[in-house]
């Protein structure tokens, strides 16, 4: 008997960033050092007790770009502008499903206010150098790090 193919899950998310509010000037040393001038939005998921980049599953007939923008707004209250597409990450879920997540850089257009819910109870802006101690997934760090390859506005 042929084995059934694992369920495919399509998801998308955003690396929502802003310049640090510390008043530090934006680096002139190139894209890699530019990450040091940025803060990134992380969401806390009480179900898993972890911090991660905002993302979620696509709805039927929804493009990955639409999914990324919708999920970021639902999870953070932030309306964003889609920037460069970053990495695509694939992994198996604990249930053995194949999940593919497409990521985009995003800049905030408007803050509609964060409202805690069952899925996400907090958001936190974190500096690049602090991410490794907070992010639950190494793939989130890889996605953020991928911003450094873009020399133009992301």
Task: Please place each PLM-identified region on the residue numbering.
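Acidic, metal-coordinating catalytic segment for phosphate/diphosphate chemistry
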Residues: 1-32
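A generic fold-level signal
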Residues: 7-11, 35, 96-98, 118
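Short beta-strand micro-motifs in enzyme catalytic cores
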Residues: 10, 39, 100-104
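Conserved beta-strand and immediately adjacent loop positions that scaffold enzyme active sites
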Residues: 13, 39, 122
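Generic C-terminal helix-cap and adjacent flexible tail
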Residues: 20-22, 149-154
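Short, acidic/hydrophobic/Gly-rich beta-strand patch recurrent on exposed beta strands
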Residues: 41-44
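Short small-residue beta-strand/loop micro-motif enriched in glycine and branched aliphatics
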Residues: 50-54
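Unchanged
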Residues: 56-146, 154
């Amino acid at each position: 008997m042929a084995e059934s193919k694992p369920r495919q899950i399509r998801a998308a998310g955003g690396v929502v960033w802003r310049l640090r509010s510390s008043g530090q000037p934006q680096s002139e040393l190139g894209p890699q050092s530019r990450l040091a001038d940025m803060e990134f939005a992380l969401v806390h998921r009480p179900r898993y007790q972890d911090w991660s980049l905002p993302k979620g599953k696509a709805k039927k007939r929804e493009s990955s770009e639409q999914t990324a923008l919708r999920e970021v707004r639902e999870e953070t209250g932030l309306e964003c502008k889609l920037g460069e597409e970053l990495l695509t990450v694939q992994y198996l879920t604990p249930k053995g499903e194949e999940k593919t997540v497409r990521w985009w850089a995003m800049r905030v257009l408007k803050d509609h206010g964060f409202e805690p819910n069952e899925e996400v109870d907090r958001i936190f802006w974190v500096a690049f150098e602090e991410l490794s101690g907070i992010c639950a997934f190494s793939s989130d760090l890889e996605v953020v790090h991928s911003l450094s390859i873009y020399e133009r506005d992301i």
